[in-house]
């Protein structure tokens, strides 16, 4: 099974939103048994907490389930266990590469790296900006392109 880990700073806004949206997209394409998704945060401040209320509100409005999602911190083991590690911004990438040390990091990329015509490289953090709508649109586009890339690469 192909595995995808979405990573943001605290695992309550962007990465759980991406996990939920990606799962929904994969399910709609009949890929539930072929691709699994998870999310984690660089920091451990929110471990055990559900997604931020702003993330929950957007996902509810979109009709996308986030049942059972609780924040967790990314681990070194995750770097080995996941085929794709998808970070939300350059700071997350730096933290993940530092954690990896001398291990291969070619499977660690930013979500918006998959969006060819994006003016942005990073998904902004709505925890600080409150712009959950904009972030949701960026994440949706990124997840659609990521899934298409995985389907092409893995011939799904």
UniProtKB/Swiss-Prot annotation:
GO molecular function: protein tyrosine phosphatase activity
Gene3D superfamilies (alphabetical): 3.40.50.2300
Signal peptide: none
Residue positions of the active site: 8 (nucleophile), 14, 125 (proton donor)
Name under which the protein is recorded: Low molecular weight protein-tyrosine-phosphatase YfkJ
Induction of the gene: By ethanol stress. Expression is sigma B-dependent.
Activity versus pH, per record: Optimum pH is 6.0.
Pfam families in alphabetical order: LMWPc (PF01451)
Role noted for this protein: Dephosphorylates the phosphotyrosine-containing proteins. Involved in ethanol stress resistance.
Mutagenesis or variant effect for residue 125 to A: Completely abolishes the tyrosine-phosphatase activity
Catalytic activity field: O-phospho-L-tyrosyl-[protein] + H2O = L-tyrosyl-[protein] + phosphate
SUPFAM superfamilies listed in its UniProt record: Phosphotyrosine protein phosphatases I (SSF52788)
Activity regulation behaviour: Efficiently inhibited by Cu(2+) ion, Zn(2+) ion and N-ethylmaleimide, while the addition of Mg(2+), Ca(2+) or Fe(3+) ions has minimal effect. Inhibited in a competitive manner by vanadate.
Keyword Nucleus set for record: no
Family stated for the protein in its record: Belongs to the low molecular weight phosphotyrosine protein phosphatase family.
Protein source organism: Bacillus subtilis (strain 168)
Superkingdom, taxonomy of origin: Bacteria
EC number: 3.1.3.48
Enzyme class, UniProt record, top EC level: hydrolase
Keywords, ordered alphabetically: Hydrolase, Protein phosphatase
């Amino acid at each position: 099974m192909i595995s995808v880990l979405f990573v943001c700073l605290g695992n309550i806004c962007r990465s759980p939103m991406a996990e939920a949206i990606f799962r929904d997209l994969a399910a709609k394409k009949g890929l539930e048994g072929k691709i699994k998704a998870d999310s984690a945060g660089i920091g451990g401040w929110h471990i055990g907490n559900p997604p931020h209320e702003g993330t929950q509100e957007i996902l509810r409005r979109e009709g996308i389930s986030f049942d059972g999602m609780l924040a967790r911190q990314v681990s070194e083991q995750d770097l080995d266990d996941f085929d794709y590690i998808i970070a939300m911004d350059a700071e997350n990438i730096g933290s993940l590469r530092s954690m990896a040390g001398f291990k291969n990091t070619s499977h660690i990329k930013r979500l918006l790296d998959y969006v060819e015509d994006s003016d942005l490289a990073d998904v902004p953090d709505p925890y600080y900006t409150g712009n959950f709508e904009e972030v949701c649109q960026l994440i949706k586009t990124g997840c659609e392109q990521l899934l298409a890339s995985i389907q092409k690469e893995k011939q799904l």
